[in-house]
């Protein structure tokens, strides 16, 4: 049993310990109590452990919201100060380290102070307390040989993390983290990992390329994975082929079934008005579906053609490409926990000099007219004039084009490249990669191993395997393990460190103001300039939530005032949690930060222009402040700046440094129509604890409906309503396709 309840040794009350999450909290009572085990099924909401106590009060030593329901689950009220008449209630208390519910028959008074939340009953009552682990860390580690058939047995246990087999498992809080995998000579299963039987079986050939794409299905359907000649999913009395194109069909089935579960769950514990239920073209008996066992319900799902509902489905969050190699098996529990779609490419595409694509385009030599805008680039332009400056002064590399002689290198603060001049009025943030030409010369390291993953329709894209992925998050096992060790975000203690080792950037003004970081009021921001190698090592070893680095990087490392610090060769233990290395070709140094202790970061693959790098830095800073994770933040920045394609995420792309006040991350869009009203939409991105399956509600527009995160659109709203929405929180807002921020929209006549 993962949750243990014991009487307090001194005070009156109980201690609740979650051995999986390694958390503990106290519930105080008004008299000594002896918790007696009770049936978890006595609770309306799902719990894993339940006890009864005799008490006149329940007190939690923290501020919380108390939600009261009838015994049948109907909402009565919620808040922190109210009174209920005598009746039988199911009451939830949030937030506490576990899900906490109590069932009581009494009159109830809820009060709060600045330190505690108290429920007082009209008399001493029998109170049933139920608890459910949030279970965001695995119950244990399965030791397994890494041959395909042994791996099938391990993946078959991923469903043991599910808190329920009902449609409510589409809620992120009812899906625990699958057990970890560890290569071993023999197959071993830890004590707390129990096999879950759903009656679903997935049959695939015993090959990594066939096993990896069905991992999220095995987890979500609690399915047994067995070897067979043709890929299919089987239940009692039905069978559904996953051929041809296993990856596509597995992804479609997950999206379809998950969406139908989100609608079906409105017949269960949370009978809300769901927009997707009201607008679906499907005419199904949702109550009947809810009552079915999982395997029988899935049999109904597979009878519905994906094409029939494809247009109704929200854009899925993540696709992960996992190379079909045994060494990548340890990543599978993390991929399943994110409910990522999975592809397993046997071959990889490499960028070529003649390939006409954005990825290849920004890796080529620049057009001569724009080369000087890239720090270290050499310009052949001769358009010097009144607005001209030395070439090479506009980017963040510390070197010229590849192959430049060592004698051509300059100290910090001096221009690099030629002394020819360029026009500073030239457009440098929207260089069309398809208009550049040339061969690979000055942009990528000699030993770079770039790969071009196939495009995906999901918001985010990750890559597991060798190579530097263009346009995808380079995910690593060590970074994902650090996710498990990361504590919950404390809004009041978020540290941001800005390091500026770029003399020219310092001359432009205060770096914090330049990057707009001062409007991140809940952040403790420190700016450091011109660090030596020793000072940089000390900085990187410090306990910092987010490092924003501005300066020079080349093949020798990060430039400091007394030389270069190459993180690939240092023994420093990095304490920085997340980072943006806003310098030219910072990929290898960013990867070294991950290897030495960081969780995730954003890096560059090429030389980057100062102006566009500054703009991107401002965007990323504000998005991280707004609770976006690294992958989604870069996705939004790339929408605004084509040069955002020069950046990728390394490590755990799901890293956040604070929680969004709205739960999910939000991007607004608005355009004025012919009647001077506004068409408005909000795109919600699942994020952190508010993962895939979360519900959202646009209360600012007085909507009673809940939504599955996706794009929510409203039409013909007055400007005053847009202002009201924008005033709630600082978030990105695209006006006619151009990025502004909600605070700017309110203060200016946009």
Protein language model regions, located:
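Long, charged/polar, low-complexity intrinsically disordered N-terminal extensions
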Residues: 1-122
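Acidic, contiguous N-terminal accessory segments
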Residues: 7-12, 113-203, 209-212
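Structural motif
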Residues: 203-207, 499-503, 528-531, 550-552, ...
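Catalytic cores of nucleophile-dependent amide-cleaving enzymes
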Residues: 472-473, 545-632
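Long, hydrophobic alpha/beta structural blocks
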Residues: 226-244, 248, 314, 324, ...
